[in-house]
Amino acid sequence: MNHLSIITDSNICKFTLHDLPDRPGIAAEMFGRLGDAGISVVGLAAAGAQLGRTDVSITVNSADAAKTAAVLDTARRELDAQGLSQKKDVAAVSLIADSLSHDPGVAARMFRTLSAEGINIDMITAGNTAVTCLIDSRFVPAAQRALEREFTGQLASR
């Protein structure tokens, strides 16, 4: 059993490019522009392509929100995306471990715990060492308390 840590970050902003062409080079172009502007992407989720188009959502540090909006608005026009949206009042809640692949069901437990608290998950990113849920920032304290209760005994000492 892994020792888990719960990390929260309320200092982020979510952007989504809607109905972006699904073709080689689009991601390189989009993330190249962000990198050239000195913007670090914190999280990324892409929807499966439908009819050759897709949505791409990213999270960035709130301090980079205005710069990100400008870069992505230009990208929207030049890359033929049909829209750009921004969400400011979001937070990331993450479960971190050395290897989540050794603990089957951790993500499901996290999702069930948040659901039981009435907390909607806006975006999910996951890898071998972390599962991160983007939620409404108002619910961070409740999410943290609920996850601490659910994972008692698995949490790394602070």
Where are these regions (language model features)?
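A conserved regulatory-domain signal marking ACT and ACT-like small-molecule sensing domains
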Residues: 1-158
